């Protein structure tokens, strides 16, 4: 998509002069942002023959441990299509934990004790998926990108972007400006690259289209705990030692829906030396968010989690939790334009810059890696911008809608709605199984497709899954109307 001409417009020379900058570094490609999508894009650009590839990131290092961002990724079949293509899967497996045989151990505060359960979304298609901490994945991708010759610049902030006089794009970073004919915006939901493109096209094509979701707006913080620790089995008073490689959920003493009930979630981590965090995800009015000091956090934990000795959470961790700013899940969202041409420069958006959503289906990193794989596949195409737009804009829209419906009540925000959703999920599974026995595969998929969450986790095409869901919804609605009409008659 070529951008329309804009007159008058300041030249890059005017822009640089205004900033007092004079050093211009000409490169073949610039990636803005060194999260998973950006580092993967740097690897892909080098793989596709680009010589001078620069990736810019404001953080000081790729693998900094940040408690507020100490979540884990599940790199599934979709994400592994890219890691397989570049030979990075084994390195990621070496730093992660396989999802094969995944189970979740529940550690209750009462006589229910401790026992393993099978998660609802533990799919056979995700058996080879890999759990890996964010810092570990970033380190693996950064090492690969640097090994391949990408120039990773950490501790560098982007001050602005503008069209250069020669048709390229200038990216101002302090005293240096990178001039490039190819830009990849991997800089998140508040993308500077996307904002730059919005100045050149009608802004509406780059404005996120937000969808309502029961999990949107939920507030979260991370509570640091040791990689392994002892808890009390309230059934018999015995000690139980957790392992870093296993997953746990720790329900609170309060069980009725109220502003004290919550659960701690711990996902598996391979490295026993890496700090571990427990996820706390609750609505904004929950009492835990009112704990303003470490002492108040400690009092809350003692009251609600008698199965956890004080030693599990240090005083420092309690204080850090109290003063940390909470995060909030975004609404599922997407943008309609994911690539454009500025002058002679090609600009592409990947990852959260084109689609963002709550982590309900674990698709953030996988959708981003699929973006990067598609980008690499079309780069040699003379019409790469149009080809990428045609492939990823529909995918971004589809995954946003799928997350909206996939598994939004898993955070215990409404007991009765969660149960109602689970009944519907079981019903869709049963209908799909029955249709598969009675009808040819293609017809069965049209009439009663498997739940959207299952198809997404199994690695099926986002757009195809969304089409099946919409078609089945229309068929179900038509059937319900027909039955109602017949009953009235």
Put a short name on every predicted segment.
Residues 20-37:
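Beta1/beta-strand and adjacent pyrophosphate-binding region of the FAD-binding site
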